[in-house]
């Protein structure tokens, strides 16, 4: 069939898209007790690794632009999880730092990866994650 390559099940993008949507659904009840959305959880993960990052650095880590991040960070600041401040050395840069509440949330969040593994019983999950990370790096070079 000449249009076989246009079938949905032949596309790389669709299983990635579907898996991403479904994985966010699995995370939702795990994050609910923390009051976090999946996107907010990703921001917290980056800040727990290293606090005091710029919006640009956060965007680079999460593959998001500042137009997407800024409203998300404003909501998180309003919730008391982080603070946004201008870099004293460069007023154009906005720095993001965790509040005490944001820091303390990490203790509760430590349970989430194990809870996820119990819900998503995938063999060779590390191999799958590494393959996806390889794909992200390949795609990032092409953008």
Identify the residue ranges that each predicted region occupies.
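Short alpha-helical "packing" element that flanks the helix-turn-helix/winged-helix DNA-binding module
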Residues: 43-44
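Charged, amphipathic alpha-helical coiled-coil/dimerization segments
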Residues: 24, 74-133
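Short helix-coil-helix linker/hinge
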Residues: 34-39, 68, 99, 125
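Residues within helix-turn-helix
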Residues: 55-56, 67, 74, 94
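The alpha-helix within a helix-turn-helix
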Residues: 59
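C-terminal regulatory/oligomerization modules of transcriptional regulators
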Residues: 1-5, 111, 126-143
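Short capping segments at the starts of secondary-structure elements
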Residues: 50-54
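N-terminal leader segment of winged-helix/HTH proteins
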Residues: 1-34, 139
């Amino acid at each position: 069939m000449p249009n076989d390559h246009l079938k949905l099940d032949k596309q790389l993008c669709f299983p990635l898209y579907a898996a991403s949507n479904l994985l966010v659904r699995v995370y939702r009840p795990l994050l609910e007790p923390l009051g976090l959305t999946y996107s907010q959880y990703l921001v917290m993960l980056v800040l727990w690794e290293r606090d005091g990052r710029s919006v640009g650095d956060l965007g680079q880590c999460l593959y998001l632009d500042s137009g997407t991040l800024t409203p998300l960070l404003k909501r998180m600041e309003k919730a008391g999880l982080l603070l946004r401040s201008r870099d004293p050395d460069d007023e154009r840069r906005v720095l993001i730092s965790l509040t005490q509440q944001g820091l303390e949330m990490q203790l509760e969040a430590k349970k989430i990866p194990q809870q996820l593994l119990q819900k998503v019983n995938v063999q060779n999950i590390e191999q799958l994650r590494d393959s996806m990370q390889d794909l992200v790096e390949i795609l990032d070079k092409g953008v």
